[in-house]
Curated annotation (Swiss-Prot):
<dbReference type="InterPro" id="IPR020584">
    <property type="entry name" value="DNA_recomb/repair_RecA_CS"/>
</dbReference>
<keyword id="KW-0233">DNA recombination</keyword>
<feature type="binding site">
    <location>
        <begin position="80"/>
        <end position="87"/>
    </location>
    <ligand>
        <name>ATP</name>
    </ligand>
</feature>
<dbReference type="GO" id="GO:0005524">
    <property type="term" value="F:ATP binding"/>
</dbReference>
<dbReference type="GO" id="GO:0140664">
    <property type="term" value="F:ATP-dependent DNA damage sensor activity"/>
</dbReference>
<dbReference type="Pfam" id="PF21096">
    <property type="entry name" value="RecA_C"/>
</dbReference>
<dbReference type="InterPro" id="IPR020588">
    <property type="entry name" value="RecA_ATP-bd"/>
</dbReference>
<dbReference type="InterPro" id="IPR003593">
    <property type="entry name" value="AAA+_ATPase"/>
</dbReference>
<dbReference type="GO" id="GO:0003697">
    <property type="term" value="F:single-stranded DNA binding"/>
</dbReference>
<keyword id="KW-0238">DNA-binding</keyword>
<dbReference type="GO" id="GO:0016887">
    <property type="term" value="F:ATP hydrolysis activity"/>
</dbReference>
<dbReference type="InterPro" id="IPR020587">
    <property type="entry name" value="RecA_monomer-monomer_interface"/>
</dbReference>
<protein>
    <recommendedName>
        <fullName>Protein RecA</fullName>
    </recommendedName>
</protein>
<dbReference type="GO" id="GO:0009432">
    <property type="term" value="P:SOS response"/>
</dbReference>
<keyword id="KW-0742">SOS response</keyword>
<dbReference type="GO" id="GO:0005829">
    <property type="term" value="C:cytosol"/>
</dbReference>
<comment type="function">
    <text>Can catalyze the hydrolysis of ATP in the presence of single-stranded DNA, the ATP-dependent uptake of single-stranded DNA by duplex DNA, and the ATP-dependent hybridization of homologous single-stranded DNAs. It interacts with LexA causing its activation and leading to its autocatalytic cleavage.</text>
</comment>
Length: 347
């Protein structure tokens, strides 16, 4: 018993003062050579322990990521099949960053940016920095310059598959270009990751899927650009359409599932589902209703929805219209959902 108590009350070992002096001298030398903050104790106030983030525009996905959105100072990869919502999700993140007063940049390697659609998602296109580079080297050089400036909060590259190496552009159609893009990405990410970490920028790479030839077991799907992006990404999101949303016979959107397949800032493998409506983006009200029903904040009996003693309406679309008009009820429900997601006790 005495031994157990002594173990519990044992003090950390005292470091030899001579060794401590030598360590402090070494730290001073490193800070003179490489700048203050090049090495620090994690217990110091100056050491950043909390990961800051920019919201994804989806409450469910913010929660699934564990830190409230896309982590700052990290590389994020969003990949999935065509028309699954990759660019839509990235544009929502840009809009959220701008709402907080941040500066956003889009490197449009696909040359397919639609300003009208971006505006509908809430993006301030007047302040958005857009570049449409001619080659992969130019695109990644632009990203590096923006990140190193320390003034940009979020940079989106759309997409990795469209980053064409200069050598491929200068060659003839049909020339063998095996491994050029993978080498380009590997070299660029080695330089970028440190700069992104120091600048606290969110850097999102949108990627496409390809099928590997001759795969007998396991998934034949792979992403473009080699393996470097998989390694350097702190977060990887797999986004898929799982169902169509119809208004009568007309398809008006898609039910979307996002799986966090890699996460170095929180536990991975969490899943978020939400609606993406054509011309509108993520259905914020639809997601709010789904989460509120899941958490028992809104009660559903048949087609009827009720909140407390108040009936909200019959059918999900009618409830969405009511919440759109009634700001007080909407904000109250949203706060309760947020409190449930974060584990904050509701008063």
């Amino acid at each position: 018993m005495d031994k157990e108590n002594s173990k519990q009350t044992a003090q950390p070992p005292v470091v030899d003062p001579a060794r401590l002096k030598q360590l402090n001298l070494a730290i001073e030398t490193l800070e003179k050579q490489f700048g203050k903050g090049s090495i620090m104790r994690l217990g110091d106030d100056s050491a950043v322990m909390h990961v800051k983030a920019i919201s994804t525009g989806s409450m469910a996905l913010d929660y699934a990521l564990g830190v409230g959105g896309f982590p700052r100072g990290r590389v994020t990869e969003i990949y999935g099949p065509e028309s699954s919502g990759k660019t839509t999700l990235a544009l929502h993140a840009i809009a959220e960053a701008q709402k907080e007063g941040g500066i956003a940049a889009l490197v449009d390697a696909e040359h397919a940016f639609d300003p009208t659609y971006a505006r509908k998602l809430g993006v301030d296109i007047n302040s958005l920095l857009v570049s449409q580079p001619e080659s992969g080297e130019q695109a990644l050089s632009i990203v590096e310059t923006l990140v190193r400036s320390g003034a940009v909060d979020i940079v989106v590259v759309d997409s990795v598959a469209a980053l064409v190496p200069q050598a491929e552009l200068e060659g003839e159609m049909g020339d063998s270009v095996v491994g050029l893009q993978a080498r380009l990405m590997s070299q660029a990410l080695r330089k970028l990751t440190g700069a992104i970490s120091k600048s606290s920028s969110v850097c999102i790479f949108i990627n496409q899927l390809r099928d590997k030839i001759g795969v007998m077991y396991g998934s034949p799907e792979t992403t473009t650009g080699g393996k470097a992006l998989k390694f350097y990404s702190s977060v990887r999101l797999d986004i898929r359409r799982i169902a169509q949303i119809k208004d009568g016979e007309e398809v008006v959107g898609n039910r979307t599932k996002v799986k966090v397949v890699k996460n170095k800032v929180a536990p991975p493998f969490k899943i978020a589902e939400f609606d993406i409506l054509y011309g509108e983006g993520i259905s914020v009200l639809g997601e709010l209703i789904d989460l509120a029903v899941e958490f028992g904040i809104i009660k559903k009996a048949g087609a009827w929805f009720s909140y407390g003693s108040e009936k909200l309406g019959q059918g999900r679309e009618n409830v969405k219209r009511l919440l759109k008009e009634d700001e007080t009820v909407r904000n109250t429900i949203r706060q309760q959902v947020r409190d449930t997601l974060t584990g904050t006790p509701t008063e």
